[in-house]
């Protein structure tokens, strides 16, 4: 992603649009039971961004949810069509997690990891080169170094 270039995305009806003003940190596919239920699918693909780089335009509503670990998250949806746009997880301070397929160019963000594969549907086959984790991964050892450093610096600069 070039400097001064933004990524864009939207809901299905177009009432909510968003921009991401910096390169995303990491993209992952989650196979946990909660993600399966909320999406009605076998997994969801999420892209993590610094929370100050996500600019939302349009009316959204949110609801608080509990994750499988019991931690809280806040899910944000279009008020008109209900498209699930992004999540803020209590355990992911300083990051917002965008539903990757709402990005206009989502094909450019394949999963860099598959998490909670212990809950993966048995008929779903992942390629041998997929970076898979039965539960969550260690961010420092999984994310690209540049993304990890940028995230840590952001937390430090913003005293989080």
Question: What is the role of each PLM region?
Answer:
Residues 1-10, 15-160:
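A short Gly-Trp-Pro
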């Amino acid at each position: 992603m070039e400097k001064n270039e933004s990524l864009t995305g939207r809901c299905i009806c177009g009432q909510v649009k968003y921009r991401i003003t910096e390169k995303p940190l990491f993209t992952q596919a989650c196979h946990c039971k909660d993600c399966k239920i909320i999406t009605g699918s076998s997994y969801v693909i999420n892209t993590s961004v610094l929370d100050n780089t996500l600019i939302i335009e349009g009316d959204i509503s949110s609801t608080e949810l509990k994750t499988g670990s019991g931690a809280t998250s806040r899910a944000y949806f279009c008020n008109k069509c209900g498209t699930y746009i992004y999540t803020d997880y209590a355990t992911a301070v300083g990051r917002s997690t965008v539903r990757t397929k709402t990005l206009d160019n989502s094909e450019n963000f394949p999963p860099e990891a598959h998490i909670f594969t212990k809950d993966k549907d048995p008929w779903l086959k992942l390629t041998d080169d997929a970076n898979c984790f039965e539960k969550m991964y260690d961010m420092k050892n999984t994310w690209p170094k540049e993304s990890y450093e940028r995230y840590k610096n952001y937390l430090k600069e913003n005293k989080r």
